[in-house]
Every structure is written in structure tokens, then in C-alpha cells.
Amino acid sequence: MSDCEEKIYSNDYVDFIISKDVLDVIDLSSDCIQRIDEEKDTYFYPRSFFRIFDFPADSYASVPKCYGLLDETALEVSGILKLQQQPALALKGQGVMIGFIDTGIDYRNPVFQYSDGTTRIYRIWDQTIRDGTKPEGIAYGSEYKTEQINAALRAENPLETVPSMDTNGHGTFVAGVACGSEDVEDNFIGAAPFSEIAVVKLKEAKTYLREFYFIPDSVPAYQENDIMMAVSYLDRLAKERDMPLVICIALGSNMGNRGKDGQLATYLDIVSRRRKRCSVAAVGNEANARHHFLGKIQPDMEYESVEVSVEENMPGFFIEMWANAPELYAVSVSSPTGEVLPKVPYRSGGRQEFVFIFEQTRVSIDYRLTGRRQGNQLIYLRFSNAAQGIWTINVYPQSIVTGDYNMWLPMRNFTSGNVFFLRSNPNHTITVPGNAGQVISTGGYNVANGGLYLDSGRGFTLSGEVKPDFCAPAVNVYGPGLRNRFVTMTGTLSLIHISEPTRQEAIS
């Protein structure tokens, strides 16, 4: 095992995503660098070198965000069967590669095989397996090719030959509904049953990031830089095969810049602009989570109060407040017992910590101007040992034009207790990267009544773009699970119905 590989997996090393334009103005070096593409790399440093917000580059943008799994008749209502059966079209995924970035795939399931029992999977890159053959140019994980998978399928114990396995079932379900082969007995067919399949099984986020973001141990979470590496890998595979590529991402996050400088969203936009490339992402299930606050300060207002309810004591949570340039704000915090952290004056790069005596809650406030293009303001509020009750954040205008700002709490499965805004707003609740301009984002509706799936994330984007682009069935979707069984799931995994219709866009 190489020294760099050990650093990629080790919790004693922190990961930073570095763009080429940062290197043009800041001299950075590391003895472990993983190339993502010509424009972006991941640098690895000992944890003792940097606190997360102390990195000399664009600190918060460089810190990998964590992404979680989005919750889980449909084909007929979507119009998929009409496309498959229309003689002039017969759209079933022929000549298209569909790539999945998720929890892996149960390659033994017959829905991922041809009628002769051979696999439809071109490659599996399993980031969690460290003792196999690594993909070219990548310092971690193990790659399994078609020939190896076919050999495994012929073996008495396939997992001894290809040990990659989806132990969660999420990735198998997504891939099956998107492109599973027909199973007449179980009345099932995927949207693109003749497509070629490529899979990346993501490794879990490092412990230091889970602790920083207060993500419960039992919840799957994945790092932004690993997802970006997966996108780069799939793009390279499609180049090798000279095939159109549709990238399916059933992951989402409330973390990071919702504008033009988010790392994953920006990278997906770059890849999706390339010929024969298309990216599809779900919009998430955050509309009714009460995790978004839309602020508006009028010129005659001294401040606006934002109330956050913490229903039980919890290890912690964080709030990201974003304002578009040239807006600038400052904040103060009041505890449930009335103790006040006075207004922290705005200073870019400034940070203040305060421990509330009665609650024993530690609150840290970081001010940042983010991105090298826009300079949008981020105020990052982190509550450790969060006490039960109503916490109040007073937002003070420092320099305003519109008076608009937004706050987001983490996705609901990334919090260990019930925390929400008392005056929440369901708009702007599309999870990243579903807000990216070049990514096809899909919301969900209920087939039974034709109504919108109420939890489905809602637009617009902060730049005013219309999102989601499509809606598809999201309630009781039928698809393959583990152990060759079929299951139903609910949520904006509706993106999987969009994969075959978008292949025409990928081809063109």
C-alpha cells in the first residue's frame, strides 16, 4: 500500500479540494495529491497542520462537503413504456453508458445481466476495497472489469472473485429502476434495459468530517471529493468506449455554496457541457423539513430575528447563512434562557466562540467571503452540545442592496435530533447538486393522485433558474433490492426515470 493511499483513507489526514486558479495565486504543496482533472485536485495534509477554517486557500469551498442518500405502474405514467414500444424510437438505452455514483451494486442480480447470463456492467470502481487493482491514475480503491465480473458469476462463490457488494441496497435499487433488464415473472423492466452500466461505490466520509458536521454514526455520508473523483472516472470510461454517458446521482446535501462556486455543482456543469455527456440529480426531500429560512431586511429595520427550535438536547448542529454579493451582514445569538452573545462585528475571516453558561452550549461564528468569482458572504454558525429550546439569531444589515439572505440547516437525516426554523420557507430547498445549471434535476409526484410529492425539493435556484427540470413518480416506486428481491421505495429517486429520455440529449 502506498504512503499516499494510506493518507487518503486515514482520519489523521484532512482533505482539501484545490482548484487550479487557487494555485495561480497561492503556493501550496503536499506529498500526497490526487488529481481529479486538469482543473481540480485533492490535497492531503496532517490534521495537526490545519483547522478546517484555517486553510490558506478559499477555506470553506476547499473543505469537502458531505452528501447523503436521498430517500427511495411508475414507468407507464412517466411515458417510459411508450418510448420503449414506439417503433420509430424504441428507446431502451442502446449504445449508451449509464454511470451510477452510490452505495455500489449487487452485480449478481439477473436484472444486470444479458439473457445469456453475462454481465451488462462494464466497470465497478469500489472505493472501499484497498487490496485490488486500482484504476489508472487513481491512488485508492479497486477496479473490476467485465471479464472479472463474468468470471465471478460463473464461480460457486462470486464474492470471492469480485468482493464488491452493495450492503445498503440504495445503489442497486437506483441502477435497477434506471436500467434493469426485463424480468417477466416479477413484472419489471428498467427505463433503459439495453444500456451499458458503470458503477462507483463510494467510501464513507472520514470521521473528522462527520464530527465537524455532527453527522450521526449510523447515517451513510460521502465526501464531495470522492464524488468528484467518481464523476471524472465515469467520464474517462465513456471516452474509452466512445459512448454517450448519463451520470446518475441520487445523493444530496444542504451544505455549501448554492451559487456558481460550489465544487461538485461546478464540476458537474463542466462535464455536462461536454459532447455526449449528461448528468441527472434528484432534488431531495427537504421541502417540508423546515430547514430553510428566507430572510428579508427592509431599509428601516435594525435587525431581523430568526428562531430555531431544538426539540431535545443534541450533540450539535450547524447553520449556513448565505448572502449574494455585495450584501453583508452580522449576527448575534440568544439562548433559550435569554443569555446573549452580542453582535459579532463583521470581519472576513473573523471567528468568535462563546459558551452559554446555563445551557453549556458552545457557539462558534465564522465570517467568510467565498468563491473567487462572486465573493458571496457565508456566516457559519456551529452549535455544540445544543440545548433544548428556542434559539434566536438576530441578523444585522451591514451593507445591503436587496436585503435578501438565506439560511439552511443540514438535511434531515444528517441531524441527530429534531431541529427546525419556526418561520421556515419551502422554496430554495433543492439539494446540491440538483441546483447546478447544466444538471437535469428531477422532482417527484404521487402517481396515485397526480399531485406533487410534498417533500420534493422546490426551486428556484438562487440565481433565478427554473428547477426542477422534470418531475417523475416518487411514491412507492418498484425496483430490485438485495438478495434478488423486488421492493418499493419513496422519495425523489425519480431521477432514475429520466435516464433513458435524456440519452437523446447525451447523444446529441
What do these predicted regions represent?
Residues 229-259, 282, 398:
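Short acidic, glycine-rich surface-loop motifs adjacent to enzyme active sites
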Residues 496-497, 504-507:
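Single conserved hydrophobic/aromatic residue that forms the stacking wall/gate
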Residues 383-399:
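Noncatalytic modules at the cell exterior or secretory-pathway interfaces
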Residues 86-223, 315, 326-327, 436-438, ...:
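Subtilisin-like serine protease catalytic core
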Residues 125, 130, 138-145, 289-377, ...:
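Extracellular S/T/G-rich loop segment that most often corresponds to the catalytic His/Ser-adjacent loop
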Residues 1-97, 104-120, 389-391, 428-429, ...:
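Autoinhibitory propeptides
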Residues 264-294:
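Catalytic cores of secreted or luminal carbohydrate-active enzymes
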Residues 371-378, 397-412:
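Short acidic/polar inter-strand loop motif in beta-rich domains
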